[in-house]
Amino acid sequence: YFKQAIELIDTLKSQVLSKELLDQISAQEKYIKNKRLLVFNEPILYNEQHNKILVDFKNIDTLYNFIYKVDDLQKFNHLKSDSLYFNYIKSQQPFQVLETALPNHGDYNNYTTEVLLPDFSQGYYVLVSSYEKNVTENTPSVRFNPFVVSDVFIVYKEFNENLELQLLNRKTGK
């Protein structure tokens, strides 16, 4: 329906219309053609194993993922807002850059797909995703997704005033 709506908008824009009506039509066209990007990932990924992210998008042909490795746990835990992420990536080089073609049928609809990530060694990472090849503070849609790569999982229980901790291997359960 969006494709038909754009055709109708193009037809209407070629006619003599009031400024108010033309503004409404232009707003609808902008809404339909607007790009959208959401990226979801697991916060803890397996060590040296293929992982994936879920990408929800609209009107985007290519997804650029920039992966930054964070060596310091305190710095990793400090990254809580977009401005802090931007400050961090300004001073770092990406550990890896992935360019992924997304299915775009030209019909202005929302789509969801999974994108495979490469294997990662144990550590702390930030995935920066955008439909722009160069990411700055002015890039319209940038997503920051921190994640940890580890095979260790912590399970804890509280009994009265005692705390019981268990470290488990996520793959073996031992």
Tell where the protein language model's regions lie, with residue ranges.
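N-terminal, cleavable Sec-dependent signal peptides of secreted/periplasmic/extracellular proteins
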Residues: Y1-K174
